[in-house]
Amino acid sequence: MDSVEFMISPNVGEPLKPLAKIISGGEMSRFMLAFKNILAGVDDIGTMVFDEIDTGISGNISQVVSEKMCNISRARQVIAVTHMPSLAAMADNHYLISKSTQNGKTLTHVDLLQDDTDEVARLIGGNDYSIYAVPHAKEMKANAQRYKDSLIK
């Protein structure tokens, strides 16, 4: 076999079409999550890395993606690079990756956050987030914890 072409029918009643030609950013994110989830079931993958799997999605779909990734994390380590508050709220541990310039060189810093509420609030409202973002972040984290607790029962 020299090559493989994925065919997809993203909507009911549509014929199969080449994935690479028709898929949007959000559809690609969901496709890759589903594909990695299937592979994880048949492969002995200890760690799965998702780099901005939330690109092109929002609202209810972002919550579904967050829950799917949480489900995956029950059996293996998940590392996710995200800018999506709902996905960040679902995480057990947060690392803040930042860059700085020193002596004409760019340095990358990785810091484990002890309290990630402010970081989730920053994802909600930007660097200068309002006082309303923190309670919202706390609510998102509480909802995420309830979801994770429901998986244990």
Where in this protein do the model-derived segments appear?
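Pre-signature/interface helix of ABC/ABC-like ATPase nucleotide-binding domains
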Residues: 17-21, 108
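C-terminal lobe/lid and adjacent interdomain/linker elements of RecA-like ASCE P-loop ATPase modules
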Residues: 4, 60-153
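Conserved helix-loop functional segments at active or binding sites
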Residues: 37-41, 59, 71
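Conserved D-loop-proximal element of ABC-family nucleotide-binding domains
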Residues: 17, 42-43, 55-63
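Walker B catalytic acidic pair
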Residues: 51-52
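ABC transporter NBD signature
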Residues: 24
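Conserved nucleotide-binding/hydrolysis modules and their immediate coupling elements
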Residues: 1
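GG-anchored amphipathic helix commonly corresponding to the ABC/SMC/Rad50 NBD signature/C-loop
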Residues: 5-6, 10-13, 18, 27-48
